[in-house]
Structures are given as structure tokens and as C-alpha cells.
Swiss-Prot record:
InterPro entries, alphabetized: UPF0478
Family label: Belongs to the UPF0478 family.
Disulfide linkage: none
Transmembrane segments: 7-27
One Gene Ontology cellular component annotation held by this UniProt entry: plasma membrane
PANTHER family linked: UPF0478 PROTEIN YTXG
Protein name: UPF0478 protein SAOUHSC_01855
Localization annotation: Cell membrane
Gene3D superfamilies, per database record: Methyl-accepting chemotaxis protein
Length: 163
């Protein structure tokens, strides 16, 4: 049985050697994977730096656009305020026109009889003025014709006598 112990030692040494070879193989495989991961991370790092630069540029552009839009909004606010003021003025004007219209309508309805009398009197006055003008015109026309007839008669008589 003495020989079992050295054989067991040899078997244990061989097993340990196989175990070490397996561990070395696994470690080599892990090393290859880690090298691949390192290369991939280097590529990703470069891409991330590129993305970071582009993102920074985009943020600067967005900030400039935001400032531009803010300036335009501020200018537009003054326009909106002006339009609101115009709207308020138009509304006030409409209210004033409504009040004046209502006042006129109310006054007309209260003074309807007086207005009717004024219209009747103005019609009478216009008729009198027309009759006065017609009468004056007829008188002027009659005198004109009478004077012309006498003048024409004298002129005709004297012209015949002189000849």
C-alpha cells in the first residue's frame, strides 16, 4: 500500500496540472474578451466624445434660438398689448355709439310730435317760398315782356320812319 500514496500524489499533481491548464485557458479567454471590450470601449469613448461635441453645439444653437425667440416674443407682446388697446378703444367707441344711438332714439320718441310739427311747418314754408318765387317770376316775366314789346314797337316805328 505504500505505492498508493505516491500514485495518489501523482494523480493529484496531474489533476492540479489539468486544473491549472484549464484556469490558464479560461484566463486567456477572459483576457481576449477583456481586450475586445477595451477596444469596444475605446470606440464608444470616441463616439461619446463626438456626440458630446455635437450635443454641446446643439445646446449652443438651442440657447441662441431661445434667446432669439424670447426677443421676438417680447416684441410680439408689445404688439399684442397694442392690439388689445385698440380692441378696448373700439369696444369703448361701440359703447359710446350705442349710448348716443339710444339717446337719439329716446329723444326722437319723446319729441315725435314736435318733429312732426316741424316737418309740417317746413313743408308749409317750402310751399309758401315756391309760391312766392313763382309769383315773383311771373311778375318779372310780365314786366319784361311788356317793356320789350314797347321797346320793340318803338324801335320798329322809328326804324321805319327814319328810312
Amino acid at each position: 500500500m505504500d505505492w498508493i500514496l505516491p500514485i495518489a500524489g501523482i494523480i493529484a499533481a496531474i489533476a492540479f496540472l489539468i486544473l491549472c491548464i484549464g484556469i490558464v485557458a479560461v484566463l486567456n479567454s477572459v483576457k481576449k474578451n477583456l481586450d475586445y471590450v477595451a477596444k469596444t470601449l475605446d470606440g464608444v469613448e470616441g463616439q461619446v466624445q463626438g456626440i458630446t461635441r455635437e450635443t454641446t453645439d446643439l445646446l449652443h444653437k438651442v440657447n441662441r434660438l431661445t434667446e432669439d425667440i424670447q426677443g421676438k416674443v417680447d416684441r410680439l407682446n408689445s404688439v399684442v398689448d397694442a392690439v388689445k388697446g385698440i380692441g378696448d378703444s373700439v369696444q369703448t367707441l361701440n359703447s359710446s355709439v350705442d349710448r348716443v344711438t339710444n339717446s337719439i332714439t329716446h329723444n326722437i320718441s319723446q319729441n315725435e310730435d314736435k318733429i312732426s310739427q316741424v316737418v309740417q311747418w317746413s313743408n308749409v314754408a317750402m310751399e309758401i317760398a315756391d309760391k312766392w318765387q313763382n309769383r315773383h317770376y311771373r311778375r318779372g316775366s310780365a314786366n319784361y315782356k311788356a317793356n320789350n314789346v314797347a321797346t320793340d314797337a318803338n324801335h320798329s316805328y322809328t326804324s321805319r320812319v327814319d328810312k
